[in-house]
Amino acid sequence: MLLATFKLCAGSSYRHMRNMKGLRHQAVLAIGQELNRRALGDPSPGWMGQVRRRSSLLGSQLEATLYSDQELSYIQQGEEAMQKALGILNNQEGWKKESQQENGDEVLSKVVPGVGKVFRLEVLLDQPMDRLYEELVDRMEAMGEWNPNVKEIKVLKKIGKDTVITHELAAAAAGNLVGPRDFVSVRCTKRRGSTCVLAGMATHFGEMPEQSGVIRAEHGPTCMVLHPLAGSPSKTKLTWLLSIDLKGWLPKTIINQVLSQTQIEFASHLRKRLESSPASEAQC
């Protein structure tokens, strides 16, 4: 009698667990389908359109692993940031030149409805893509060592192999006219063929409340796109879309100057870092 009761309870529990697992998988698939539906515009030709199409297949990528509801939310936010950022980059209309350096580094900008003014850095680097990926992703927390505009970056939480929650403390800028800011962001990293995309946007993380004496700013949909120069795999084209709400009261002229200058300085500091720091065996 006891044995029969045990078997009955065990069978019911097993069916319940199977049903729960199935429901979680259905939820994951629903998220993937919703992201696919929200993708900006129709699939477009070229490498950027290919990345957008493939990155929307979230459901099938997550089926094998179960995440908490909060983790799924962060993964979804990262995917949405990537879709929005790539959608902005893919629209070639309306870009205006902010500055251009003698070495060819260029910053463009435009106003995007619902987002605000965004900045686009175009850089060609004499380094293979895997080397950039190593420095920008694998060594992310070391960025404060070579980029004086960043005091510190910490990974607060890692979710799977593609998603992280980070806290970034930025230095004061424009002769201290812009005081120190910090950012809490969800970041998503994907590789599609020969292209790597590093995307992110602001998020809420309860374990990192606002800090005293620092203004909590927010990243809008932001991304870096890395892909080898056609015919020269030892060189990499880097495109950085920057969207930031610095918060506080600041004249637009100062904001525009600070953000475009930040991108130019980033390219310069990154080059020096790549030339002076040895590469490891990291691969994108």
Curated annotation (Swiss-Prot):
Chief localization: mitochondrion
Pathway(s) per entry: Steroid metabolism; cholesterol metabolism
Record carries keyword Transmembrane: no
Subcellular localization: Mitochondrion
One Gene Ontology molecular-function label: cholesterol binding
Modification sites for Phosphoserine: S56, S194
Biological process according to GO: bile acid biosynthetic process; biphenyl metabolic process; cellular response to alkaloid; cellular response to antibiotic; cellular response to cadmium ion; cellular response to cAMP; cellular response to dexamethasone stimulus; cellular response to epinephrine stimulus
CDD domains named among the record's database cross-references: START_STARD1-like
Catalytic activity: cholesterol(in) = cholesterol(out)
InterPro entries: StAR (IPR029866), StAR-like (IPR000799), START-like_dom_sf (IPR023393), START_lipid-bd_dom (IPR002913)
Record's keyword terms, sorted: Lipid transport, Lipid-binding, Mitochondrion, Phosphoprotein, Steroidogenesis, Transit peptide, Transport
Cleavable signal peptide: none
Domain named START: residues: 66-279
Transit peptide (residue range): 1-62
SMART domains in the record: START (SM00234)
Gene3D superfamilies, A to Z: 3.30.530.20
Gene Ontology CC: one annotated term: neuronal cell body
Protein function: Plays a key role in steroid hormone synthesis by enhancing the metabolism of cholesterol into pregnenolone. Mediates the transfer of cholesterol from the outer mitochondrial membrane to the inner mitochondrial membrane where it is cleaved to pregnenolone.
Subunit-structure text: May interact with TSPO.
Listed name of the protein: Steroidogenic acute regulatory protein, mitochondrial
